[in-house]
């Protein structure tokens, strides 16, 4: 494929503590081409430059999952509001023994991602059309997952209400943010206490090429989430906790 797509493997080794295999590098490139092709009919991403895509979709997705990259990890992840498949698809490529559920409320996007995952040979990916509020109240999904990821979905307090009900006790959620303020941190602490969790890590970094600021907020579920949460569809965003 001749698209200018290239991974700075040395940089990834230094910043992520992990190096993709040649097969994984091919899958990342195929993911790029698949997303660009799908972007012609679906609003998947505004990022189409290969170098920017590599930094802001691939590297950024994996930065929040650094603890899993060197651990030969084999748990179950749910990517909530996956949109164009980030961070779920990069996670599925990197974590070959994991199982990744891509959840989104837009059927056309989910149908596209299902086809793309098959084209990439990702047998560890499943997809579903749904809302996090509904899934968090479904007995088959509630308290099921080891990790949850959520990026570009809404305020951190809302993301916490989407994620924590779906996690097992001891499970973790990664909230991908840009800037992070003290006001947001205080509100999130209040919300996760209500939901049966705690904030266990706030990792600040800068993207390796553009220098854009990023924060990954890691939550851990420490107790069963009260049955009242998540609230009905729309309420978490209309009346955020915290």
Curated annotation (Swiss-Prot):
Annotated S-adenosyl-L-methionine binding sites: 81, 86, 104-106, 132-133, 151
Record key words, sorted: Cytoplasm, Methyltransferase, rRNA processing, S-adenosyl-L-methionine, Transferase
Transmembrane spans: none
One GO molecular-function entry: rRNA (guanine-N7-)-methyltransferase activity
Top-tier EC class: transferase
Pfam family of the protein (one): GidB
EC numbers, comma separated: 2.1.1.-
Family matches, as CDD domains: AdoMet_MTases
Matching InterPro entries: rRNA_ssu_MeTfrase_G, SAM-dependent_MTases_sf
Location(s), subcellular: Cytoplasm
Any one GO cellular component localisation term in the record: cytosol
Coiled coil start-end: none
Signal sequence residues: none
Family to which the UniProt record says this protein belongs: Belongs to the methyltransferase superfamily. RNA methyltransferase RsmG family.
Protein task: Specifically methylates the N7 position of a guanine in 16S rRNA.
UniProt protein name: Ribosomal RNA small subunit methyltransferase G
Source organism of this protein record: Synechococcus elongatus (strain ATCC 33912 / PCC 7942 / FACHB-805)
């Amino acid at each position: 494929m001749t698209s200018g797509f290239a991974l700075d493997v040395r940089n990834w080794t230094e910043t992520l503590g992990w190096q993709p295999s040649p097969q994984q590098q091919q899958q990342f490139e195929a993911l790029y081409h698949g997303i660009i092709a799908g972007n012609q009919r679906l609003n998947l991403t505004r990022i189409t430059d290969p170098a920017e895509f590599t930094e802001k979709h691939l590297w950024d997705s994996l930065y929040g999952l650094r603890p899993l990259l060197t651990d030969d990890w084999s748990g179950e992840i749910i990517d909530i509001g996956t949109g164009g498949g980030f961070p779920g698809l990069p996670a599925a490529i990197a974590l070959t023994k994991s199982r990744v559920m891509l959840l989104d409320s837009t059927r056309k996007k989910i149908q596209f991602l299902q086809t793309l995952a098959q084209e990439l040979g990702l047998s560890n990916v499943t997809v579903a059309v749904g809302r996090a509020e509904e899934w968090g109240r479904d007995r088959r999904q509630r308290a099921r997952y080891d990790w949850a990821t959520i990026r570009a979905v809404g305020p951190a307090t809302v993301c916490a209400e989407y994620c924590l009900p779906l996690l097992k006790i001891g499970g973790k959620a990664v909230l991908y943010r840009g800037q992070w303020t003290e006001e947001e941190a205080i509100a999130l602490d209040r919300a996760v206490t209500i939901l049966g969790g705690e904030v266990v890590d706030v990792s600040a970094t800068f993207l390796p090429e553009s220098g854009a600021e990023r924060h990954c907020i890691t939550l851990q579920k420490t107790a069963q989430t009260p049955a009242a949460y998540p609230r009905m569809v729309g309420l978490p965003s209309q009346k955020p906790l915290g």
